[in-house]
Every structure is written in C-alpha cells, then in structure tokens.
Amino acid sequence: MNVVFLSPNFPPSLYLFCARLRELGATVLGVADASYESLRPELREALTEYYRVPDLHDYDALVRALGHFTHRHGKIDRIDSLNEYWLETEARLRTDFNIPGLNAETIGRVKRKSAMKRVFDRAGVPTARGRVVRSAPAAREFVEEVGFPVIAKPDVGVGAARTYRLENDDDLTAFLAGRARMDYILEEELTGELLSFDGLVDRKGHIVFTSSLVYGLPVLDAVRGADMWYWIDREIAPDLAEVGERLVRAFDVRERPFHFEFFRRPDGSLAALEVNMRQPGGLTVDMWNWANDIDFYRAWAEVVVKGTTTVHTDRPYYCVWAGRKAGKPYRLDHQGVLDRFGALLVHHERMDDVFAPAIGNYGYILRGPDLALLATAAAGIQELATPAGRQ
C-alpha cells in the first residue's frame, strides 16, 4: 500500500503515525517544505521516500510530487495529513489522482460551518442559529433576530483563529470595518460546558474507538489570555454518544479520526458546535494513549492498512492537560511543579508557538483515577503568585 503523508514533520508528533504505517508494511511517502536533514531521525527512518517542495501551498509542486511517487512506486492508495489546515489540499489531490476519501465534492460539508449546520439540521441535532454575512445590513439583520452577544468566526477556519465575541453595536461596527476578506458566519452565543465526542472510524464506517474531552473554559477565553485546562473523561454520557454516533453516520465518516464539539447547555441538553475530520489538537492523541493504555497511532495505521482495528477502551484513568503561558507570574516554577505533582505527571513539554494562544507555551499532562485530585493539581500548576489566582 502506497500512502502519501503531507507535512509529516508538523505537528511534531505526526511522525508516529508514519512510523506505525511503516511497521505494518506500508510504503510511506512524505511531502513537505522542510529539508530532509531537518526531519527527526525516527521520521526519516519511517519514510520510504521524501519529496521536498518549495512551499506546501504550491499546488502544482504537490501534483509533481505525487506524479513522481506514482512513477516510482505505482498508484497512490491513500493521502493524509491528519491536519485541519491541509484538509482541502488533500481533498483536491484525492480528486485529481482518484484516491479514496474526502474529495473536492465532499470536503465542503466538513470545512464550511454553514454547511455543517445543514447536516446538523438534517440529522435532527440542535445547533446555534447562524448565518453567513457578507454585508453590514445582513449582519445587523441577524443580530436583530438573535440579540447580543454573537460570535463571529470564519466560515472556513481552524480553531479559534480570527474568532470574535461581539457584545454590543460598537463591537459589531468595529468587526465589520476590520474583518478580513473572507466569508464570516455570525452565530448566537451558546452557553454551558464545552465538551467533545471523539473517535476513530474504520473503512466501513464502524466506530472502533471513542473518547470525550471536557474543557475547563471556552477556547476563546484561552486565546484571550486565560490558561487552558481540559481532561479526558472516563465515561461518555449516553446522550452524547448517541448524538455523536448519529453525526458520524450523517457525515459519512470513514477511515479517519474525528473530533465533534458540543455545548452541554444549562438545561442539560446538547447543542452541536462544529465537526472536525481529524483528531483533536495538541497532544490529545498521547492523552488518549495514557488514559486507555493503548497505541492510537497503531490503531489508525491498522485502519488504513487493514481496514479496521480493535481498541480496548476501558478508560481506567482520567487524563488532564494543564497549560501555562509565557510571561505569567506563576506561584510554582517548573521545578516546583515537578517536585509537588511529579507523582501525577506522565509528561510535560514546551509547545510550538502556533499552539500557545489556545493551550499554552508549556503543557503538563496528569493521569489518575481521581478527577478531583487531578483538577486540584491542575489548579496548582496554573496558580498565579498574585491574588488573581487561575486566569
């Protein structure tokens, strides 16, 4: 099996997906704009061949790369990046090279938030009222319908980038004057607990792994400067599982991981926020592994190579992420965190700057069967030396 992996060097942990593919006998073909010498040794060992392009945004260069691979190795069977940023590029390449998976015709429903809402509606899943607005009158008409506050976000976007909370008419006026030249969708603000239904689907559309994240605060608050913390729950609420499984069918997810976001509203009901056809960001895959004592990287590779996999998800542990941001006066320095909470820590590392606004410049991962104990530790890690406490 010939598998092309776009940007296998970033995010850094992606090399493990390539390594597991190679272990299962796949021919792994990497394409990126980094020099071969800059790739970590484990990635170089996993790749059968590497093709460097001047810029991954240069589609003609990518076509030449896949043409080269086809000439050298035969038909390309799969292409992936497991990275939201490159999903549309993957889809276009699949179309042009007749590769199975999301293609140019189907990618819109999982990239455009307005298209997602139409699928939510057809599946009978509640979601925030929203509308793509291309003019000031259209934006004001929508606000008159739902009232402030509203959330403005790119119709096609990644994470919380270029997302704004508009609380009044002054905010709306400023947004309309300064917004980027792209389609924006305005949504009524939903309140409640942010959580997710995540997993892996095999080639026939069967869910073979599930998990759920619970966020300690909204991602938009983290982007504004607050410290993010979230955890992998040991139990998935039945209604969350039912709605999540319904959306897997509605979006016809196959042979890939997924990350569906919801609000648990104050009345206990669920409302869909958005879907992502990839694993959650940061080090969440590693957190899945620690929470379940599994190897998700291998599970994904088995789905690609063999069509399915078996994953034991007993969820014996909660797994908590506690991020810290550069320049904040934390009560405990790094060594203090290790000394005080070392028994609960399974990993810690500095994060790439691109992830810092949402999840922090440095992250600590804690594991254990007692969520209250882990939450107390996360609060201690993020506690500031000033009376303000956790931000």
Set out the residue ranges of the language-model regions:
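Short beta-strand-to-turn element immediately C-terminal to the catalytic PLP-Schiff-base lysine
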Residues: 133, 163-168, 200-202, 231, ...
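ATP-dependent carboxylate/phosphate-activation module, predominantly the ATP-grasp catalytic core
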Residues: 188-253, 257, 264, 276-304, ...
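ATP-binding N-terminal substructure of ATP-dependent carboxylate-amine bond-forming enzymes
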Residues: 1-106, 137, 369-390
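Conserved ATP-binding module of the ATP-grasp superfamily
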Residues: 126-129, 145, 149-152, 161-196, ...
